[in-house]
Regions:
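Extended catalytic cores of very large enzyme megasubunits
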Residues: 3-7, 13-496
């Protein structure tokens, strides 16, 4: 006679061996552990670099949530963390999927270094960036302190300029991968009033020795106002910036004074200057020679906002991210090239809880992207996330203490929010819309680092099905119209 426990064991073994995603989902539903977002595309994404060898998606979720609860000394939170991810309320960043709760890599997503104007400091920061990339991070650096090309240096020679040193970082990105998951990526930031700005704007041009770097210009108020007022030299440079953005999508534009006017109060009180952003330009934090800013990221799924809005999901997300930060701090102890990042993590504990699925929520509820209703939802959702994340940070400070920078502020984290691009994360989470961006097309091929996938707008498909129009001829017509439905007379203006 086969016992109930033996039957359960055999059934789970059979489940783990099944290759067909539909059969797997059926078994999960029978066991009351559905992961609705786990389809062919999301599973392929995860299996191509985010899971350990032989690990299932469910095993990865167990690994990550158990590690987070352990860092918080709160094992009772494991079921709540699991519910958050299996229901699709939260999306982990790529390094969290790949490295949280493992002996490899680190679970932090982004870093920035402040490159000083002396050779020992430059080479040390290069070492930092290589190590940050190796363990799974996207990186950036501020080069504004480096002297212009041709400036005298102490040995009676002349400086080769900021851009020449960027070549070292460019080469590093060509040979170092992010924890084996993807090629390294680095953004170089330079002030628009730096003497090497025109050389900098030629990065990634045909014939340029620098082809792998991303780039950003830091623009102060005085410079922008002079340009607007008619300074011809500045207008020529601004024209080159705009031309470069049109041709290459770069540089990012970082408005230095605007950022520093709106930085957290603690940084204003302590006179901390924010010079640059991160690789994806969503993080604004201070870096120095001794501290390299980091920010650990994950995102709330706005597509399912109505499911989690009346729960403690945001609080749990902040608790989770603080646990990720604790794992980073523990794992980096004793690592020479990560001490700058570890110093920042210990002293600031900056978090970046963002969102994805914004456009999917609007489409799900038939709300036009530029409507007043969309603006009202935008304000409501982000107000809630901001308020609840601050409450959570205060709770964490009461439980675990304030970090050095926040002594006397009653907070655990200098920042709690950031809007990351989430291209891979949204693909994993049921192909919801990335970040706060709109879908560019209703029918297209998504070319991602982990593969190419054909995408149909699921809410459009549902609408077409209701109208009896969900067929290949209609979709072919949509494809020929570059993914647009504006030509379809069968749809109302609101539906379009």
């Amino acid at each position: 006679m086969v016992t109930k426990s033996r039957k359960t064991s055999d059934r789970m073994l059979k489940y783990l061996l099944l290759k067909n995603i539909k059969k797997r989902k059926k078994i999960m539903e029978e066991q009351n552990t559905p992961i609705w977002w786990l389809n062919d595309e999301s599973e392929q994404m995860l299996n191509r670099g985010y899971l350990l060898k032989g690990e299932t998606v469910e095993g990865a979720i167990d690994r990550i949530t158990t590690a987070a609860a352990k860092r918080l000394y709160k094992p009772e939170l494991i079921p709540a963390f699991k519910e958050m991810i299996t229901k699709g309320w939260i999306s982990f960043s790529s390094p969290v999927w790949a490295n949280m709760g493992t002996q490899r890599g680190l679970p932090i997503s982004c870093f920035n270094v402040h490159v000083p104007d002396y050779i020992e400091g430059i080479t040390h920061k290069l070492g930092e960036v290589i190590m940050q990339t190796k363990i799974g991070g996207g990186t950036s650096g501020y080069f504004g302190e480096l002297r212009n090309r041709g400036t005298a240096v102490t040995d009676n020679g002349k400086s080769s300029g900021a851009v020449s040193f960027m070549k070292l970082f460019d080469t590093a990105m060509d040979v170092v991968s992010q924890g084996g998951v993807r090629r390294g990526a680095f953004a170089a930031y330079l002030d628009i009033d730096h003497g090497d700005i025109e050389e900098f704007l030629n990065i990634k041009e045909i014939g340029s020795p620098i082809q792998n770097l991303f780039m950003g210009v830091c623009v102060p108020d005085y410079w922008m106002q002079d340009m607007i007022d008619g300074d011809m030299d500045k207008r020529k440079i601004w024209a080159k910036v705009l031309e470069s953005r049109q041709k290459k999508g770069l540089p990012y534009i970082f408005f230095t004074d605007n950022v520093n006017r709106n930085k957290p109060q603690v940084y204003k009180d302590k006179g901390a200057v924010i010079n640059a952003s991160n690789l994806c330009s969503e993080i604004m934090l201070p870096s120095t020679a001794d501290e390299s800013f980091i920010c650990c990221l994950s995102s709330m799924n706005l597509e399912l906002y109505d499911e989690w809005k009346d729960t403690n999901a945001v609080k749990l997300a902040i608790y989770f991210l603080d646990a990720v930060l604790s794992e980073f701090i523990d794992k980096t102890e004793g690592n020479y090239y990560l001490q700058g990042a570890r110093n920042f993590a210990l002293r600031h504990r900056a978090l970046g809880l963002g969102v994805l699925g914004y456009h999917s929520y609007l489409q799900k509820n038939m709300i036009p992207f530029e409507s007043m209703e969309a603006k009202m939802f935008n304000a409501k959702a982000f107000k809630q996330i901001q308020e609840q994340s601050i409450i959570a940070s205060k709770e964490l400070a009461n439980i675990y203490g304030e970090p050095e920078v926040l002594k006397g502020y009653g907070l655990r984290n200098t920042t709690t929010m950031a809007i990351a691009p989430t291209t891979s994360s949204s693909a994993i989470l049921g192909q919801t819309s990335p970040g706060i961006e709109p879908f560019a097309s209703n029918y297209y091929k998504a070319g991602l680092a982990k593969g190419n996938f054909m995408r149909k707008n699921k809410y459009l498909a549902k609408l077409l099905e209701e109208k009896g129009l969900d067929n290949e001829d209609v979709w072919r017509e949509i494809m020929l119209n570059h993914g647009s439905v504006q030509h379809m007379k069968e749809l109302s203006q609101t539906e379009k």
